[in-house]
Every structure is written in C-alpha cells, then in structure tokens.
Amino acid sequence: MFQLVVLLACSWILIRIVEKGDLSVLGLRPTSKRFVHGAVLFLLSAACCSAGYLTRVFFAAERFVLNPAIDAGLVFTGIWSNVSSVLFEELLCRGVGLYLLIKLLGRSWAVLISAVVFALLHWLNSGVFGDPLQMLLVFAFTFAMGLLLAYAYARTLSLYYPFAIHFGWNIVQNFTFPDGPFGNTLLVQMLPVPEVTVSYAVFLSIFLFPKLAAIVLNFFAVRRMTPALKAAPDAS
C-alpha cells in the first residue's frame, strides 16, 4: 500500500511539473462504459488463462483441489495482493510516464518503450537470469502483453482497460491456481505431480495458446473501442 501511495504521489508531482496537469490523465473516473468494457476485457483474460489450466488437467492429468487452509483472510489477502501488484505495475508502466511519452514521441514509440520496460521488469521479478531459454520465453510473452496493455491505455487514455486485462490473467494464475508468487490460492495441486509425456502440439496448446489467445482477443476488443486521443494517431 505504501508503494502505491508513493507511486501515485510521484506521478502527480511529475504531471504537475511537466504540464501543470493532474492524475485525471490516468482516466480513472468511473463510468458505466468503462465498467462494461473493462468487465469484458477481464473475462477474456480470465477465460484464456483458465483454459490453459483446463488443458493441463485434461492432457497432463494434473489435479487441483480446494485449498484446505482457505478462509476469509486468505481470500482477502490473495485478492488484495493481486490487485495491488497489478495496480503498481500499471501505474509504473502505463501511468503518467506513458501519457507523457505519447505526447513527446507519439503512440508507436511510447507503446514500444512501455512494453520493453514491462518485459525487463518481469525479468527482474521472475528470477530467470542465467537461463537464456527462460529469459527469452519470459521476455517474449511479457513484451507482447506489454504491447497490448500499453496500446489499451494509448487508445483509450484510461488505466481501467489495461488493468482489467492484466488483472484478469493474474487473478486466475496467481490466486485461483497455485502458480503465483504470493502463496494465498484458492486451489492447490494434488501431489505427486504426474509425469506425462505429451506431443509438441499438446505442449503448445497448454502453454502457448492461452497466452496468444488472451493477447489477440483483447487486442481486437480494444481496437473496437473509440480512440480517446486524436493526436499522434500512428499507434491507433
């Protein structure tokens, strides 16, 4: 919580110094349109992420059961951990900095820079340094997702949309299923984990298809939205 407050304060100071603006550039005023569109993006991401786990159950014989330690505290902590982490990353990578980059460099360059920063941030957080293949895979997915999230903000000038996409994926991966860093999950994996040999097609359907589907479906959903910024149309 303290980190969020500090980041918001720094964002306000930055926009105030650069163009005497305020945090309204983040597009956080709630409207029915933003709620409906955000809900659609959230559900698309959550459904795509869930599909990956369902294929693991079907093809890899993995089993997940309700966490025996579940209680109200675990649920609250698990949800809040994901809300705060996603919000922090959105403010850092798609907040005032992205808004100013759009005005300075145009949308295409701003989106590209934001995506690179997002990918590098996940390199630091995922502990993959020293493993070239893992570094490549993490960078490829997070860079592609970073492009989508930055594009969502650049097109709509609202953090609701990148937040909804990002949170929809993370809440399934990190809270519903036990693949996140926080440890407070609704489901846990039954042990021992089965050792199953699958084809390359099945492997790709488990680990690659859900990610690609989330990026592609959300991209087209965002693309259908009315652009909020008429200047620097090169990234529309």
Pin down the residues of each PLM region.
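Juxtamembrane helix-loop-helix connectors linking adjacent transmembrane helices
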Residues: 23-91, 98, 102-104
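Alpha-helical transmembrane segments in multi-pass membrane proteins
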Residues: 1-15, 36-43, 72, 76-77, ...
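Functionally important transmembrane alpha-helices
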Residues: 137-193
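Small-polar-interrupted transmembrane alpha-helices in polytopic inner-membrane proteins
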Residues: 82, 86, 107-123, 142-143
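C-terminal membrane module of polytopic membrane proteins
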Residues: 171-236
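Aromatic-anchored segments of alpha-helical transmembrane domains
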Residues: 46-54, 115-125, 167-179
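Hydrophobic cores of alpha-helical transmembrane segments in multi-pass inner/ER membrane proteins
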Residues: 6-14, 45-46, 81-87, 146, ...
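Membrane-interface helix/loop boundary segments of multi-pass membrane proteins
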Residues: 91-113, 154-158
